[in-house]
Amino acid sequence: MPSASQAPQGLHESIPEHSQQSLKQQWLAILSVAVGAFALVTSEFLPVGVLNDVAGDLGISAGHAGLMVTLPGIMAAFAAPLLSVGIGAMDRRYLLIGLTLIMIIANATVAYASDFNVLLAGRVLLGISIGGFWATAIALSGRLAPRGVGVAQATSIIMLGVTLATVLGVPVGAWLSGLMGWRMTFLVTALVGVPVLLAQIFLLPRLNPDKAIRASDLPALLIHPLARVGMIAVLLIGLAHFAAYTYVAPFFKHSSGFDGQTIGSLLLLYGAAGVVGNIFAGFAANRSVRRTLLLVAMMIGVSTALFPYFATNLVGAALLIGLWGFAFGAFPACASVWMFVVAPNDVERGMPLFVAMFQVIIALGSFFGGRIVDQLGTSMLLALATALVACGFVTVAVLGRKVSNRLAAQA
């Protein structure tokens, strides 16, 4: 197993798109994308923290309210490949800026929605921003990496925005909803996007693609057997996570009997653990992405398996939600680094389809999770999630046994 200093060149070294900028400017550029990821993920998963409030205010079930998570995922699945092909050779900097503007408009639409249908229209609009952003930002992480920062670390820097969103976004969203209502919470999120937009306008360097992505480029990752193995594992583990985590707040309320403040604190713990997990993944995945993903799957599976039995008391809930948060904080970075390892030359071309698949996972997970919660309850949902994670673990352990970070150096 190589040490950090012996990491594969494809992961250890950056591929700077902005080599003429100062080191400070390079760091500010990648941080502006990380902050954009924070704002976007806060917007995407804000309903997780306010699900009970929205459902109660609009007189709908928690499962029905879960469409606020499902519809953006569906729209993002279409937007990722369509935008990537449709924009041709456009400077990706302008795309990122435009998508941040769409995010602001989408959140404002939800805040002022007159009924649930208008609210969902705003969430569909958000899906466009989500799909386009992820198809662009993750694929360009290596080109935005400051001097001396590897691709795995650059990816984890951007993904840090995601995990910080779970620390500050979802829990603070739940807290703000209790303080001033869920509508004002979405309006505040829209306003937070304004400085993010300005930061990207002034800080992002030119991000011209090597060549325009064509429709025939989208399946680029699918031609690699080990990339397909990674996609299957991500599908199984991701479905389990999003099906279960979307309805954690209702579980805490109805099964554990926790009040809103306690639920917000537990979600904050989840996010804080996720930050640690994300940082851990930036280093561990650089050594062995396969072993890191196996550890992540095992921790998520243990969490979902024990949740119905031990998360009904505060200590058990805190321990399990912390373990779950740490594991999932590492998961997105592992998924991206896996693709850099097994298909380093095809990541940018194939990332839009990978992002589309990930968004389908979010949509299907929250959708079927909602149906299961409404019909069978959260305990059955968690049991099914555990089974899916176990299948993902076996996929990585057996079908992915040939995956080694040395593959990136050989490409």
Predicted feature descriptions by range:
Residues 78-117:
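Conserved MFS/SLC helix-loop-helix module at the cytosolic interface between two early adjacent transmembrane helices
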Residues 106-109, 117-126, 315-323:
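Paired small-residue
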Residues 114-118, 147-204, 259:
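Helix-loop-helix hairpin linking two adjacent transmembrane segments in secondary transporters
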Residues 122-161:
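Cytoplasmic helix-loop-helix junction between adjacent transmembrane helices
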Residues 291-335:
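C-terminal transmembrane helical hairpin of 12-TM major facilitator-type secondary transporters
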Residues 57-59, 91, 112-118, 257, ...:
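Helix-breaking motifs and short loop linkers at transmembrane-helix boundaries and internal kinks
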